[in-house]
Amino acid sequence: MNKVPLLEMRNITKSFGKFQALKGVDLTVFSGEIHALMGENGAGKSTLMKILAGAYTTTSGEILIEGRPWSIKGPKDALNAGISLIYQEMQLAPNLTVAENIFLGSELSRGGLVQRKEMVMQTQAVIDRLGAQFKASDLVMGLTIAEQQQVEIARALHRNSRILVMDEPTAALSTRETHRLFELILRLRDEGMAIIYISHRMAEVYELSDRVSVLRDGQYVGSLMRANLNANELVRMMVGRPLSDLFNKERDIPLGHLRLNVHHLTDGAKVQAVSLQVRSGEIVGLAGLVGAGRSELAQLIFGVRKATGGTIEIDGVPLVIHSPREAIRHGIGFLTENRKEQGLFLELAAQDNITMATLERDACYGLLDRKKARAISDDAINRLNIRVPHAQVRAGGLSGGNQQKLLISRWVAISPRILILDEPTRGVDVGAKSEIYRIMSQMAREGVAILMISSELPEVVGMSDRVYVMHEGRIAGELHHPDITQENIMTLATGVTEDHKKEVYHD
């Protein structure tokens, strides 16, 4: 690294009215460095980067580029400083070509005529440098999300940007697309670019970053070099407490009667003769690899998928559940895996999302009782600590953690007997995870039977009283404490037999 930082942000303060979003934040970034920026939602990461990109102006503080003070009052000042920011939501015109997007606002012209051929040639040269598969003449609307991201990066390279800010760039990418993006980021770093990488995903930070800086409550907490990265320390810096305190599972909750009894449940495709039980007050983990049939099993119980065999009993009563409406009537709640596509109504208010499952129960002669709906939503917002200014705020404008808690509150509102949670903390930061774990533990104490599907093994180990592991549509095994370990779960999830365990783990 060079001794003189490429970028210094010193004592940056930003206020919105009486609210102070940033309180004297410092950030130093060098050329040829991938610098991860971490923190809970609301910690100030996006605000700090919007100041750097010229979307916001500072209340106080200064920005230096290569040791020289640089005034950034708007996006043009940031571009002149060699700074580009790639937002989570792509800033592209879908009905224009790649070349037209690259040159948007700075079109090449001669004699009053736009030089389209030259623009295409220059754009294609940048695309080839990236190793992308699309062409400069392709319409952006026909590209994948990963390819659109490459267009954003190509635009930054065309502008000769030296500092590239990426805000949660893998949120909508597949595993393969993420791997390709990482290869590109590492190549850009090796070419001397400074990359500020905003993410809440520790695995990505461990794989990519040369250094990590953490913000908490609008303040700079500290930085760690790659050699010193430690999950416990990162969590402590982000939330003010160690990783061991993250899981809020109470082990002294007395278990009640058998609440959910699934026997030989089958759909003829993804789920084969699955049997499991969950007691009142119990959190049961359901682990397994992608494609093992976990989500499909949950959909069978909730009536989304049709069972071809097997039985479901709730509190000892055999039931045939044909639809989600019937499941809700029987006191079953289901947090879906993808909150944006299968759970939330993003354009509706928080209150409407919360009360969606109680409409049939609380309607009077087919009319919504608005006073009761408001009371239900206000109670849920307070109980789950959902950070919204009011109940009428649009759900799509909330952070990932608050969206997830909003969806959980929908099922809390029906006072469920059984709650199925499919990837309950996917896509949320550490602080929101801790809140969700607290909610789960509280509901278990109130007697709710919880079936938790999760691909995060520390979560399964930390929150489960028992664990079922699925492999190829069947239950491969059941684990009790102290045998609930990541190694034992993976052994069952991958179909490794007792005869091969020693070979796999100790070869």
From Swiss-Prot:
Gene3D superfamilies, per the entry: P-loop containing nucleotide triphosphate hydrolases
Protein's gene: rbsA
Domain ABC transporter: 7-242, 253-497
Pfam families reported for this sequence: ABC_tran
Domain of life: Bacteria
Lineage: Bacteria, Pseudomonadati, Pseudomonadota, Gammaproteobacteria, Enterobacterales
Protein's name according to its UniProt entry: Ribose import ATP-binding protein RbsA
Entry annotated with the keyword Repeat: yes
Subunit structure: The complex is composed of an ATP-binding protein (RbsA), two transmembrane proteins (RbsC) and a solute-binding protein (RbsB).
Membrane topology: Peripheral membrane protein
Keyword set, alphabetical order: ATP-binding, Cell inner membrane, Cell membrane, Membrane, Nucleotide-binding, Repeat, Sugar transport, Translocase, Transport
Entry function: Part of the ABC transporter complex RbsABC involved in ribose import. Responsible for energy coupling to the transport system.
GO terms for cellular component: plasma membrane
Keyword Transcription regulation found: no
Alphabetized SMART domains for the sequence: AAA (SM00382)
Residues where ATP binds: G39, E40, N41, G42, A43, G44, K45, S46
Organism: Yersinia pseudotuberculosis serotype I (strain IP32953)
Reaction(s) catalysed (UniProt annotation): D-ribose(out) + ATP + H2O = D-ribose(in) + ADP + phosphate + H(+)
